[in-house]
A protein has these predicted regions:
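Feature captures the catalytic ectodomains and active-site-proximal regions of enzymes
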Residues: 1-279
Length: 279
């Protein structure tokens, strides 16, 4: 199947702990509209265990926890990443810049994040304020630079609220509404910027325990993947199998960068107009 054409920039927005059923017009109008007018699946799966460190490391390396070995916060396993082909390293080899936009992060987590990012190939980290809207605005500015490349934006309001009050509780849905402000900024990219926007989550939550997500359960494992922008099909709800491991190959292919043979996911070719037309 043909690969997607090259876009000038790509943005990956990770909304930590966002369940697909929280994406509804009364809570997340911007993300709901983006999903309804572009390509999406609400049946994608994250990795096992369904925890943030394992999922983010899979996004950073293109391989599952059984290969990368990082399932809990810590610096001991970082050396294993050097034996892999991290996404950021691979992009740098192909002269594609990468930037990361995050909110206010506690110092211990920021230190761990910097160590993980350095082991995964390195990228410029920019910290915004507490409001997800500021993260979205920061990522939008990075994505519109002449040397944009890949921008990764991360917000964790849903995860914090889920652990404190329960997934799909009123505070959780309020947090989802705040995260939608980041989407509102980034959604402006999809019209005329030759940019690809991918919105996803690292895990769900509330499947067994209302305030957690680490045990095996479909609600904990199911995540949304929404693709919008350059060359993406309109108004398609996919029922084909997809996983979080498909995101790195899809981003690379959209940026015109070859996908390493070691990557365990696939390009989501069915999301792109060119591939659908040739099928």
């Amino acid at each position: 199947m043909p690969t997607p054409g090259r876009c000038s920039s790509a943005v990956l927005l990770i909304i930590d702990g966002l369940r697909p059923d929280a994406i509804r017009p009364d809570t997340m109008p911007s993300l709901s509209a983006l999903r309804d007018s572009h390509w999406s699946t609400s049946r994608a799966e994250t990795v096992a265990p369904s925890v943030t460190v394992a999922a983010l490391t899979s996004l950073a390396t293109g391989v599952g926890p059984g290969t990368h070995g990082l399932i809990a916060p810590g610096l001991r396993s970082l050396q294993r990443l050097r034996r892999l082909t991290p996404l950021l390293t691979h992009l740098r080899r192909h002269r594609v810049p990468t930037r990361i936009a995050v909110g206010a992060v506690p110092i211990p987590r920021l230190i761990l994040a910097r160590a993980l990012i350095a082991a995964a190939g390195g990228a410029e980290i920019q910290c915004a304020g507490d409001d997800p809207a500021s993260v979205g605005a920061l990522a939008l500015g990075a994505a519109r630079r002449a040397d944009a490349g890949l921008t990764v934006a991360y917000v964790n309001d849903c995860d914090v609220a889920g652990h404190a009050h329960g997934w799909m509780s009123r505070p959780y849905l309020d947090a989802a509404a705040r995260c939608d402000r980041a989407v509102r900024h980034l959604a402006t990219l999809v019209d005329g910027d030759n940019a690809l926007l991918c919105v996803t989550a690292d895990h769900g939550g509330g499947g067994i325990h209302p305030t957690d997500h680490d045990l095996p359960h479909p609600i904990n494992a199911t995540i949304p993947i929404i693709l919008a922008g350059a060359g993406i099909r309109g108004s398609v709800r996919s029922d084909q199998p997809a996983t979080i491991l498909d995101i790195p190959p899809t981003l690379l292919s959209a940026l015109g960068v070859p996908v390493p043979a070691s990557y365990e996911g696939r390009v989501l070719s069915e999301a792109f107009e060119a591939a659908a037309a040739a099928a």
